UniProtKB/Swiss-Prot annotation:
Record membrane topology: Single-pass membrane protein
Organism of origin: Ipomoea purpurea
Record note on quaternary structure: F-type ATPases have 2 components, F(1) - the catalytic core - and F(0) - the membrane proton channel. F(1) has five subunits: alpha(3), beta(3), gamma(1), delta(1), epsilon(1). F(0) has four main subunits: a(1), b(1), b'(1) and c(10-14). The alpha and beta chains form an alternating ring which encloses part of the gamma chain. F(1) is attached to F(0) by a central stalk formed by the gamma and epsilon chains, while a peripheral stalk is formed by the delta, b and b' chains.
CDD domains: ATP-synt_Fo_b
Cell location: Plastid, Chloroplast thylakoid membrane
Protein's name according to its UniProt entry: ATP synthase subunit b, chloroplastic
Further comment: In plastids the F-type ATPase is also known as CF(1)CF(0).
A cellular component term, taken from the record's GO annotations: chloroplast thylakoid membrane
Length: 184
């Protein structure tokens, strides 16, 4: 406090103690007035200013604390969202893999059933070919047999006469008779 008083004394000439009045010299009174106002402000305003600064400091600290809490909550929500995202990505990957597996399985089943159908068609074709070959062979055999029979009949008819015919029948009847006697 002594420093403040000394600073007032050094500012300029003071009027004598016996006279009290107004100094109209603006340049002489301004520094004195300013120093008085500053002194009063410092003396009385120190507590108010200290309280204001403390309040401001507390508000800033509270704001920082609230911001830190909000930041912590945001980080926690972000981690939860990331975990949910990872879970969903994993499930999506599983669905994708399962979907591809299911598609591949269906594709293989379709290919296998197509091969089986083709194999059955090939078997039916081969059976039809064999059947047609057999039928053609039977027709050829029948035709050959008919032609051979017609030639044989033609040959027999041209070679046989009634007398030879009667002798052949008598010989066959004789053989049948002897066979009957043997069996009795």
């Amino acid at each position: 406090m002594k420093n403040v008083t000394d600073s007032f004394l050094s500012l300029g000439p003071w009027p004598s103690a016996g006279s009290f009045g107004f100094n109209t010299d603006i340049f002489a009174t301004n520094p004195i007035n300013l120093s008085v106002v500053l002194g009063v402000l410092i003396f009385f305003g120190k507590g108010v200013l200290s309280d204001l600064l403390d309040n401001r400091k507390q508000r800033i600290l509270n704001t920082i604390r609230n911001s830190e809490e909000l930041r912590g909550g945001a980080i926690e929500q972000l981690e939860k969202a990331r975990a949910r995202l990872r879970k969903i990505e994993t499930e999506a990957e599983q669905f994708r893999v399962n979907g591809y597996s299911e598609i591949e399985r269906e594709k293989l089943n379709l290919i296998q059933s197509t091969y089986k159908t083709l194999e059955q068609l090939e078997n039916y074709k081969n059976e039809t070919i064999r059947f047609e070959q057999q039928r053609a062979l039977n027709q050829v055999r029948q035709r050959v047999f008919q032609q051979a029979l017609q030639r044989a009949l033609g040959t027999l008819n041209s070679c046989l006469n009634n007398e030879l015919h009667l002798r052949t029948i008598s010989a066959n009847i004789g053989m049948l008779g002897t066979m009957k006697e043997i069996t009795d």
